[in-house]
Amino acid sequence: MAAPHRPGLRISSGLTIPEAELSWRFSRSSGPGGQGVNTADSRVELLWDAAGSSALTPHQRERILDRLGGRLVNGVLTIAASEHRAQLRNRDAARERLASLVAEALRP
């Protein structure tokens, strides 16, 4: 289970995205899930402003904007997760996806 207090999203030993730079949106998820699927906001969207991030060096920012340019809208990367019935699990899945995507984009 995830820790309730997170100082940030660790991408690598040299890069952690501060929690304050991560924004969340919640909505109802579609698909199976029983009665709760229509009443619980279990779908999550994690937004991170890569273009304006204070965590990145200029080189890292340039590489991310170049490699993830097709996924960015006005410099903001959005990750959606709705595969789990619980919002907390979807939040964790979105965080893991963001970390993986950014780490892959920063690889030489």
Residue ranges and their predicted role:
Residues 1-108:
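Ribosome-associated translation termination/rescue signal centered on the conserved GGQ peptidyl-tRNA hydrolysis loop
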